[in-house]
């Protein structure tokens, strides 16, 4: 098994986001900043490609921050995410001079302020908010519900627990605390509504709610925050039924929504940023497997009958791509070594792990003569495969060729 990362695809997708959003927001707020979400696939190469295409880099741990810095990314163009950053991670970010630290809670804000004061620095902070927008996506990867670990709610708190003030939103309390802290430089706010999103409506709704919150901040504190990050979640085509919109179309629709809202609220448009990850790295990756055992079984059908299903086992599985197991993610597969005139038959591509759920592609038509030693290619595996891989069953992690 081997994962191939194709620079030309990565660069093309990165450029499409940068140019599309820059053009859409040029007149409104001087353009947009695109942060590549490194959690989707971060290596020295992908960090360097992103920077060379004019993107910034979003990291989610001290390890990812170290990779971005080692790749030569300008620290001022790096963001550090994470709902539970360690002291070491925060101190490293402060010492390196990262451009933004995205803060998820009042607890973290208070702690970061103390660390920054101790270091004699001002921490550049974006407050992550949960706008209550529910994207049409899998429950396990939706991140804008109120009952979840990320962000500060825009809804009023019901109790005074953990720094909350009953009747006041945790987001409003955090903004007041950030503005009052001498060691905090409050740049703006951030939100993220989910993953694998194909339409622009969700982003526009989230932007509207957050901009209304910025208007409340202006009214209460006399301050207009300068930046608004709308996160990532832009979808890609894993199979033929997926139809994501081009980056430029999403950008144009979002810019129109933002312009109408800032004009209605009497706000100066904040600098817009976004964090595509999968949308850039996903299509740039291709996993090659070697076929081993094949067998045909009788499978039950919904009408009570039976149908033949062919199982195609490969030399990898859930250790190199856990997404089908974790999220019921769909992929497709094609024969990669040779052409075949054999009839395509309904097949299920499975891994070699000691797990009945070790399924890579649930239903796909593959040549009936596909057999031992043939190569099978699974496209769109550039995101959340290699970075989530493991050594389960003591299998080796596959190499990445870039």
Identify the residue ranges that each predicted region occupies.
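Active-site-proximal beta-alpha core segment in soluble small-molecule metabolic enzymes
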Residues: 26-227, 257, 262
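Short, glycine-/Ser/Thr-/acidic-enriched flexible segments
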Residues: 9, 41, 64, 85, ...
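Charged (often Lys/Glu-rich) extended helix/loop segments that serve as interaction or gating elements
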Residues: 253, 259, 263, 267-402
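A non-catalytic, amphipathic alpha-helix used as a structural packing/dimerization or gating element
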Residues: 9-16, 173, 209
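Short, small-residue-biased leader/transition segments that mark boundaries at the very start
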Residues: 2-6
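Short, electropositive alpha-helical surface patch
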Residues: 199-212, 243-252, 286-297
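Catalytic palm subdomain of template-directed nucleic-acid polymerases
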Residues: 236-243
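A glycine-rich phosphate-binding loop feature that marks nucleotide/adenosyl-phosphate handling sites
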Residues: 9, 192, 227-233, 269-281
């Amino acid at each position: 098994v081997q994962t191939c990362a194709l620079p030309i695809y990565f660069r093309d997708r990165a450029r499409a986001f940068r140019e599309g959003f820059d053009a859409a927001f040029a007149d409104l707020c001087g353009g947009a900043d695109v942060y590549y979400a490194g959690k989707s696939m971060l290596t020295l190469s992908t960090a360097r490609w992103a920077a060379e295409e004019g993107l910034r880099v979003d990291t989610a741990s001290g390890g990812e921050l170290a990779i971005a810095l080692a790749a030569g990314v300008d620290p001022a163009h790096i963001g550090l995410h994470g709902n539970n950053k360690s002291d070491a991670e925060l101190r490293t970010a402060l010492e390196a001079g990262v451009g933004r630290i995205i803060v998820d809670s009042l607890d973290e804000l208070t702690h970061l302020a103390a660390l920054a004061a101790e270091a004699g620095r001002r921490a550049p902070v974006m407050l992550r908010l949960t706008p209550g927008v529910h994207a049409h996506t899998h429950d396990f990867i939706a991140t804008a519900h109120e009952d979840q670990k990320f962000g500060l709610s825009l809804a009023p708190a019901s109790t005074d627990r953990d720094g909350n003030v009953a009747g006041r939103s945790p987001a409003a309390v955090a903004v007041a605390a950030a503005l009052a802290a001498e060691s905090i430089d409050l740049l703006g706010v951030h939100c993220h509504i989910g993953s694998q999103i194909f339409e622009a409506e969700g982003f526009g709704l989230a932007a509207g709610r957050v901009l209304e919150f910025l208007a409340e901040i202006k009214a209460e504190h006399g301050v207009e925050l300068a930046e608004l990050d709308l996160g990532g979640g832009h979808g890609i085509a894993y199979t033929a039924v997926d139809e994501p919109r081009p980056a430029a179309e999403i950008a144009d629709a979002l810019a129109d929504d933002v312009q109408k809202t800032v004009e209605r609220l009497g706000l100066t448009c904040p600098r817009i940023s976004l964090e595509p990850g999968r949308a850039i790295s996903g299509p740039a990756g291709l996993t090659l497997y070697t076929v081993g055992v094949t067998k045909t079984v009788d499978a039950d059908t919904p009408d009570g009958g039976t149908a033949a299903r062919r199982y195609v086992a490969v030399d990898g599985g859930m250790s190199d791509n856990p997404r089908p197991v974790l999220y019921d993610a769909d992929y497709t597969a094609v024969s990669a070594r040779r052409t075949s005139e054999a009839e395509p038959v309904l097949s299920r591509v499975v891994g070699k792990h000691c797990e009945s759920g070790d399924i890579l592609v649930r239903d796909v038509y593959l040549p009936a003569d596909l057999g031992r030693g043939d190569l099978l290619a699974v496209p769109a595996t550039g995101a959340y495969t290699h970075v989530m891989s493991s050594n389960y069953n003591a299998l080796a992690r596959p190499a990445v060729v870039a």
